[in-house]
Amino acid sequence: MKLLELIEKWAIETPDQTAFVWRDAKITYKQLKEDSDALAHWISSAYPDDRSPIMVYGHMQPEMIINFLGCVKAGHAYIPVDLSIPADRVQRIAENSGAKLLLSAAAVTVTDLPVRIVSEDNLKDIFFTHKGNTPNPEHAVKGDENFYIIYTSGSTGNPKGVQITYNCLVSFTKWAVEDFNLQTGQVFLNQAPFSFDLSVMDIYPSLVTGGTLWAIDKDMIARPKDLFASLEQSDIQVWTSTPSFAEMCLMEASFSESMLPNMKTFLFCGEVLPNEVARKLIERFPNATIMNTYGPTEATVAVTGIHVTEEVLDQYKSLPVGYCKSDCRLLIMKEDGTIAPDGEKGEIVIVGPSVSVGYLGSPELTEKAFTMIDGERAYKTGDAGYVENGLLFYNGRLDFQIKLHGYRMELEEIEHHLRACSYVEGAVIVPIKKGEKYDYLLAVVVPGEHSFEKEFKLTSAIKKELNERLPNYMIPRKFMYQSSIPMTPNGKVDRKKLLSEVTA
């Protein structure tokens, strides 16, 4: 598969086909090619001997997709940075990545960034001034060069930049198109922010098949009336989201085949797909295929998949996450470093061309999580699971990293920033489950000196500080105040005791 060439061919074959829609804004494949070519030409002219990654800032604007392709055509990996990411985190991403340039599809509110900022108006000027110029195809990202870098939660308090190469992305996209039976010219839901790698599951399978990406932004999701009005207009055929988002949509009685009559495929990734959610979807969309998938950011979106049928639902209360893609393999490793037999739990290790080359600028973290097995890259996921008859079953995290509403986060990172807040002496984050999946985060806090008369005022003050340091999805929903944190005999936080206390 030649990824960029496949996307480019639609600009020739179906130039007026819509590539991306967001509210009232849309771009065709012709415009996508012309503007990304113009941008790539400008980047190559402005930075002729440089291959540093480029930050791309915004939310669901069509210019985000143009910027992504412009970067890689000029030989630079892109780093998607969503508007919701706090200034402090954006600053740390800029410093860690070594980026020299930030392309903005929206107003940048972060100050003192160590990068050159190209504003929305600057971009329009570049698209106009360099229109008709084509970049040298030899400059484009290829092989084991980084295509994109996505920053995920890190236990040290600093986000980790996961490097995904061109070859990684080709491996994923080829598998997704073939195994999920995606067709030419379909409409794909684009719900996940671009800084979340679930978005890759719809972006590139859509673009290489001449599809249309239909973007739903966070404001729509916060206003169900707007959300369902948009969905009714969309004619979506391929639905890509976390199970949580689909579960929220199912609360609306009209969310069914009558709203989306041409729905063909549901693709789920990012968290556990509950049996009851899949069952409701089959009832509402009897003609659609439901695919449950699994994979960490470090292995390029997903590496397993299974068609969830009524027979599968009847057979498994907790759904399997699927069979491994053909060019990769799964190993279940026991604590002693040996491979577990069929049916025995251990750590899921992914081997093959989907695996990242490591964390940008973090050799120690890379060495800890990545290795080589039989000459191939391998990633130690930290996820517990087992394989039975070729099917992978996921059993949660081995450490304190969890997935909440599709977002992966390390509890230690949240604790790190919580303990740095004013009025906090000590703190532990306890993830609270509802059924099979995590529902919310509870912060157990030992408060420092403060003058607040009411606990809710103290909580508001702490949350205000956290909002400056962490994305909204990492802010604990509830706070509990105690005089001390229980400890185990060896001096570690007794998380099991805490969990039993707060759920009693």
UniProtKB/Swiss-Prot annotation:
Matches recorded under NCBIfam families: AA-adenyl-dom, D-ala-DACP-lig, PRK04813.1
Known role: Catalyzes the first step in the D-alanylation of lipoteichoic acid (LTA), the activation of D-alanine and its transfer onto the D-alanyl carrier protein (Dcp) DltC. In an ATP-dependent two-step reaction, forms a high energy D-alanyl-AMP intermediate, followed by transfer of the D-alanyl residue as a thiol ester to the phosphopantheinyl prosthetic group of the Dcp. D-alanylation of LTA plays an important role in modulating the properties of the cell wall in Gram-positive bacteria, influencing the net charge of the cell wall.
Name the record gives this protein: D-alanine--D-alanyl carrier protein ligase
Gene name of the record: dltA
GO cellular component terms attached to this protein's record: cytoplasm
The organism of origin for this protein: Bacillus cereus (strain G9842)
Major enzyme class: ligase
Pathway(s) where this gene product acts: Cell wall biogenesis; lipoteichoic acid biosynthesis
Keywords carried by this UniProt record: ATP-binding, Cytoplasm, Ligase, Nucleotide-binding
CDD domains: DltA
